[in-house]
UniProtKB/Swiss-Prot annotation:
Broad EC category: ligase
Protein's UniProt name: UDP-N-acetylmuramoylalanine--D-glutamate ligase
Entry similarity comment: Belongs to the MurCDEF family.
Record SUPFAM superfamilies: MurCD N-terminal domain, MurD-like peptide ligases, catalytic domain, MurD-like peptide ligases, peptide-binding domain
Taxon lineage: Bacteria, Pseudomonadati, Pseudomonadota, Gammaproteobacteria, Enterobacterales
Protein's pathway: Cell wall biogenesis; peptidoglycan biosynthesis
């Protein structure tokens, strides 16, 4: 289907990387959109072309209700009253992913989930390129999809957040994957977790091949499931599964052994699942199995994702700053094997999530919890006997450096958004690395 944007009043919401990519997309088509940002001083303001009309400081602007088409950046909630009013007036509101999907003719692999998206998307990009594809990776991983549009591409790998899926309606994926679904971004969704889950599930609606995590008990009745192929991973009854009868779990497809985890650099069940689903995607794309296995054997963790920064004098320091929800902290704790004390750095903006699921884990572990940031005091009350409140990350690391002993593991796995004290999780992780080098 061909879309004609000429003669339409087009408005872009947000001056982040996504917003800038949308401006450039329309300018290449000879169309001048307008743009609004909620901030009075957006960091990317200098990137706005001089001939583009803009408004700063608030979304409550007449341009919204005068528009024919609004392209909304993922950081802006779709549930703002003025946007609800715009929809009621019949104004079309879409994401940059929707714009992208209208332009692409080659296969798309869409990857979403609460945790693990960037890791799996990067694995698949490497496997695809090794298999001879001209593959491009973009989306939530940090490169807007409109920036990777290429007429010579023969495959796109797209990492998708729930925010990006909210206003995406015509994404026709060759393969769609939901890695996992657990509580996150509850403060974004008026109807809570089920609304967040349903948004994630929408990635399957127009997909050809749907890869599902059997542990999440996906309700297929909620998905437009006509003419779809379903592939499962996770449990013992899944197509792709992990056999854990030995010290080194083995990855299987059906009853056939694929890979022994002793042969790979990554460790922890969350990483074994990431490799498992990458194998499922690779097989569905008919990438040569040997290419996939060779890439996965040599793959190491991405920065800020259970990244071992230092292992000296019997003490391991692990940077898992990408942990921005409860489930990711739970997974990180379950991946640690130590005879000493786990010293967990937990805190930031909890996004109204329920952290009580960590109670039982804390009770069974030899652990000391250092709670910091905006919700640090609240988090310290989950397991008061093992917790201490510290104002910020720096003070927490200084305190830990005085208490740590040989055999201990220091884990930054905050389980929270970083935006209360940092620009993003990368800045938080980089500070942690800097402090380790300076203090320990």
């Amino acid at each position: 289907m061909s879309y004609n944007y000429f003669g339409k009043k087009i408005l872009i919401l947000g001056m982040g990387l996504t917003g800038i990519s949308c401006i450039n997309f329309f300018l290449k088509k000879g169309i001048k959109p307008k743009i609004i940002d909620e901030s009075k001083h957006p960091s990317n303001f200098i990137k706005i072309p001089q001939n583009i009309e803009y408004s700063l400081g608030s979304l409550d602007h007449q341009w919204i209700l005068e528009s024919d088409l609004i392209v909304i950046s993922p950081g802006i909630s779709s549930f703002k009253p003025i946007l609800i009013k715009a929809r009621l007036l019949g104004i079309e509101i879409i994401s940059d992913i929707e714009l992208f999907s209208r332009e692409v003719t080659c296969p798309i692999i869409s990857i979403t989930g609460t945790n693990g998206k960037s890791t799996v998307a990067t694995m698949i990009e490497k496997i695809a390129k090794k298999s001879g594809y001209k593959a491009f990776l973009g989306g939530n991983i940090g490169v807007p999809v409109l920036e990777i549009l290429d007429k010579e591409a023969d495959l796109y790998i797209i990492e998708l957040s729930s925010f990006q899926l909210e206003n995406t309606f015509n994404l026709k994926s060759k393969i769609a994957v939901i890695l996992n679904i657990s509580e996150d971004h509850i403060n974004r969704y008026p109807n809570g977790f089920q609304q967040y889950k349903n948004t994630k599930l929408s990635v399957y609606n127009q997909a050809e091949i749907c890869i599902i995590n059997s542990n999440d008990k996906i309700e297929k009745s909620l998905i437009h499931s006509k003419n779809k192929k379903w592939i499962s991973f996770g449990t013992n009854r899944s197509d792709y599964r992990i056999c854990s009868k030995s010290n080194d779990p083995i990855l299987f497809f059906k009853n056939k052994k694929i890979l022994n985890t002793s042969e790979i650099l990554l460790y922890g069940y969350h990483n074994y699942n990431n490799i498992l689903v990458s194998l499922a995607i690779s097989d569905a794309m008919q990438f040569p199995r040997n290419d996939a296995i060779n890439v996965l054997k040599s793959f190491s963790n991405l920065p800020h994702r259970f990244q071992i920064i230092k292992n000296e004098k019997g003490v391991r320091w692990i940077n898992d700053s990408k942990s921005t929800n409860v489930n990711s902290t739970q997974v990180a704790l379950n991946s640690i094997k130590t005879t000493g004390t786990i010293r967990l750095l937990l805190g930031g903006d909890s996004k109204s999530a329920n952290f009580n699921i960590l109670k039982n884990i804390f009770r069974t572990l030899k652990i000391k919890i250092y709670c910091f940031g905006r919700d640090g005091i609240k988090l310290s009350k989950i397991c008061e006997k093992k917790s201490i409140y510290v104002e910020n990350l720096k003070k927490a690391v200084i305190l830990i450096s005085k208490q740590v002993k040989s055999g201990d593991t220091v884990l930054l796995s905050p389980g929270c958004s970083s935006l209360d004290q940092f620009s993003n999780f990368e800045e938080r992780g980089n500070l942690f690395i800097k402090l380790i080098k300076e203090i320990t």
